[in-house]
């Protein structure tokens, strides 16, 4: 898929799509992995149900699924997804309560075939690279940040602390 995108041979079926539909399908796509890893997946109730973007639903679902899958693989017990519409952009957030990503790994996380420290042995480093290429095609970008208390409306664990990683997918 990534090679086809890079070769510019993919035909996109772009139309207005709801972020809620992308997120729901991505969540469905990773439920078996969540069950296997005993990770709870939740969607922020404060999300904007009417938030939409102009993009290809299939490919955006592929991108978000890859990001959510990564978050689940590195979560301790929970992954949360939110989606919002602002005046200048729309945004999907995916955050977990696992280990943070090192600054060195953040520099390369979207590089094809890059497997950062702490990656499973069977990781080939394509998923996040593919996600970034898809989002970029639709005039977006992905931020990766450490999850801090001020990012969350409430915390992911009982100690009133937040750890983990947050992916912010922003569409302009």
Which stretches of residues belong to each language-model region?
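Short conserved segment of the HATPase_c
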Residues: 101-114
């Amino acid at each position: 898929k990534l090679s086809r995108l890079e070769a510019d041979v993919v035909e996109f079926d772009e139309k207005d799509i709801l972020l809620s539909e992308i997120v729901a399908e991505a969540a469905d796509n990773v439920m078996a992995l969540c069950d296997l890893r005993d990770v709870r997946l939740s969607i922020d109730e404060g999300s904007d149900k009417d938030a939409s973007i102009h993009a290809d639903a299939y490919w955006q679902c592929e991108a978000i699924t890859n990001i959510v899958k990564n978050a689940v693989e590195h979560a301790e017990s929970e992954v949360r997804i939110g989606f919002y519409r602002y005046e200048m952009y729309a945004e999907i957030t995916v955050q977990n309560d696992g280990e943070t990503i090192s600054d060195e790994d953040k520099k390369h996380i979207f590089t094809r075939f890059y497997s950062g420290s702490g990656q499973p042995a069977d990781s080939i480093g394509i998923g996040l690279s593919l996600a970034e290429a898809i989002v970029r095609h639709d005039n977006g970008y992905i931020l990766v940040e450490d999850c801090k208390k001020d990012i969350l409306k409430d915390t992911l664990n009982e100690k009133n602390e937040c750890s983990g990683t947050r992916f912010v997918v922003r569409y302009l």
